[in-house]
Regions:
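Conserved ABC ATPase signature
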Residues: 116-120, 124
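H-loop/switch region of ABC-family ATPase nucleotide-binding domains
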Residues: 176-177
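Conserved ABC ATPase "signature" region
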Residues: 97-112
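The feature captures the beta-strand-to-loop junction immediately N-terminal to the Walker
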Residues: 27-29
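Helix-to-loop junction immediately C-terminal to a conserved catalytic motif
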Residues: 42
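Catalytic Walker B motif of ABC-type/P-loop ATPase nucleotide-binding domains
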Residues: 141-144
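A short, surface-exposed alpha-helical micro-motif characterized by mixed small hydrophobic
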Residues: 182-184
C-alpha cells in the first residue's frame, strides 16, 4: 500500500497485517508516516496504490463504520460537553442521553454535561474525545498520540480505558513516542521509518531484540538520519 501527498511518498509499499483483538503500537521518528498510517486506515487519506482490508471488507465506507479515531489534538465543537456527545450520536445510530451520560461518567466527566467544551482542560478535552469515540461501539480504535502532554490522571484513565476496551474484544492501534507506554500497552509493534515498515513483531521481541539498526537506535533514543 502506498500513499502520496503532493509529490512526496508518505507510505511506501507497506505490507502489514494487524491481528484481531491486539494492541499495536506504531512507532518511529518524526516524519516516519505514523499519523498518515492511522489516517489512511480511517479513510481520511487516499491510497495511491494497494488496498486496505478489514475483516474481509474492502469498501472504505464499510471499514470506516467499524472504527473510531482519537486525535492528538481534540477536535470538538464549540458547544457543551453533552452537545458534543449528541452530535456524534446523531451521525450514527442514535443513543439515549442516559447512555451518553454513562460514557461521560466512564471517562471521569460526570456532571460536566452543560459545561462548554472550550472551557475544559487539555486532559478533559481528550477524555471527551475518548467518550465520543466509544459512542459508536467500534471494533477498531485508532489513537494518534492520545496522551501526549496530558496530566497523570487523564493519562492513566485513557490507558486503563484502552486496556478495558481491548479486554472486551476491541482491536487497538496507537502511535506514541513514549517507549514506556508502548511497553505497558502494546501486544505488537509496527516500526516505521521514512514511510517504510522496517519491523513488525510482538512487543517483547521488538524491545528485547530489534532486528534493524534503525530500530535499535530509536529504542536507544538516538537520532535517525
Amino acid at each position: 500500500l502506498s500513499v502520496v501527498l503532493g509529490q512526496k511518498i508518505i507510505l511506501d509499499k507497506i505490507n502489514c497485517k494487524i491481528k484481531s483483538n491486539s494492541i499495536t503500537a506504531v512507532l518511529g521518528p518524526n516524519g516516519a508516516g505514523k499519523s498518515i498510517f492511522l489516517q489512511t486506515i480511517n479513510g481520511l487519506v487516499s491510497i495511491q496504490s494497494g488496498r486496505l482490508t478489514f475483516n474481509s471488507m474492502q469498501n472504505n465506507q464499510e471499514i470506516r463504520e467499524q472504527q473510531a479515531m482519537v486525535f492528538q489534538t481534540p477536535v470538538l465543537l464549540r458547544r457543551t460537553v453533552m452537545a458534543n456527545m449528541q452530535f456524534v450520536s446523531n451521525l450514527r445510530n442514535k443513543k439515549s442521553n442516559q447512555l451518553l451520560k454513562n460514557l461521560l461518567d466512564k471517562v471521569g466527566l460526570e456532571g460536566y454535561e452543560e459545561k462548554p467544551a472550550r472551557l475544559l482542560s487539555g486532559g478533559e478535552k481528550q477524555r471527551l474525545s475518548m467518550a465520543r469515540a466509544l459512542i459508536v461501539n467500534p471494533n477498531l480504535l485508532l489513537f494518534d498520540e492520545p496522551t501526549a502532554n496530558l496530566d497523570p490522571y487523564s493519562l492513566n484513565l485513557i490507558e486503563d480505558l484502552v486496556l478495558e476496551e481491548n479486554s472486551i474484544g476491541k482491536t487497538v492501534i496507537f502511535t506514541t513516542h513514549d517507549m514506556s507506554q508502548a511497553k505497558r500497552l502494546a501486544t505488537d509493534v509496527i516500526f516505521l521509518n521514512k514511510g517504510k515498515v522496517l519491523e513488525q513483531t510482538v512487543s517483547k521481541t521488538f524491545f528485547k531484540n530489534p532486528k534493524t539498526l534503525e530500530a535499535q537506535k530509536y529504542i536507544n533514543g538516538e537520532i535517525l538520519i
